Design a protein with these regions (language model features):
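Positively charged, aromatic-accented nucleic-acid-binding surfaces
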Residues: 21-23, 34-37, 96, 100-101
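Short gly/ser-rich loop at a beta-strand->alpha-helix junction or flexible surface loop bordering the NTP-binding
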Residues: 2-3, 24-66
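Hydrophobic alpha-helical interaction segments
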Residues: 74-145
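Generic recognition of short, well-ordered alpha-helical interface segments
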Residues: 15, 33, 37, 85-89
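Short, aliphatic-rich beta-strand segments
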Residues: 69-73
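Short, charge-rich amphipathic segments
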Residues: 16-28, 102-108
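Short beta-edge/loop segments at beta->alpha junctions of small alpha/beta modules
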Residues: 1-23
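Short amphipathic alpha-helical patches
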Residues: 42-50, 61-68, 113-121, 133-137
Length: 145
C-alpha cells in the first residue's frame, strides 16, 4: 500500500531501496547497491543516479517501480563473496569514489553513519580486499578527539 504525504495529501513514490530489498527477499537473491547509488544511500553524494543498479547473485533483471526502474546486474560469486550489509555498501561507495575521491569529509560522514561494531567489522573485512580501501577503513574506525 503506497505511503501518503499528510501535508500534501498525495501518494508518495515508493522507497527504491525498500522495494529492491523486498524483491531480493522474494526472489532469494543477495543484492548490493552499486557505485553511485551506494554513495547516495550513505550520504556521500547528493546526486541520485539516473540508473539505480544493484549487484546480485540472481539473473540480470529490470523492474519498474512507478516511473523509476531498478536494474539488477548479475555479479560473479567471487565479486559478491563477503559483501553484506553496511560493509558492502561502504565498499561499493568507496570503489565509486575512487582512492583520490575520498577526503576528510567522506571519512567523517562514514564515521557518523557507522556504529562502533560496524567500524570494527569494516576494518576486519577490508583486510582481505584492496589495500587503499583497507587504509580508508582504518581511518574511518580511528577514534576522534
Amino acid at each position: 500500500m503506497p505511503k501518503v504525504n499528510p501535508t500534501l495529501g498525495g501518494k508518495l513514490s515508493p522507497d527504491i531501496d525498500e522495494a529492491a530489498q523486498a524483491i531480493a527477499r522474494r526472489q532469494r537473491w543477495k543484492i548490493v547497491p552499486e557505485g553511485a547509488w551506494a554513495a547516495n544511500l550513505l550520504g556521500l553524494s547528493t546526486q541520485v543516479p539516473a540508473k539505480i543498479i544493484y549487484l546480485t547473485d540472481g539473473p540480470n533483471n529490470e523492474v519498474l517501480i512507478g516511473r523509476r526502474s531498478i536494474h539488477f546486474k548479475h555479479a560473479r560469486p567471487k565479486a559478491m563473496a563477503g559483501l553484506e550489509g553496511k560493509f558492502a555498501l561502504v565498499v561499493q561507495a568507496l570503489r565509486y569514489l575512487g582512492k583520490e575521491g575520498v577526503s576528510t569529509r567522506e571519512i567523517q560522514t562514514l564515521r557518523t553513519a557507522l556504529s562502533p561494531a560496524e567500524k570494527r567489522r569494516l576494518v576486519k573485512d577490508a583486510r582481505f580486499g584492496v589495500d587503499w580501501i583497507y587504509e580508508v577503513a582504518k581511518r574511518i574506525a580511528e577514534k576522534t578527539a
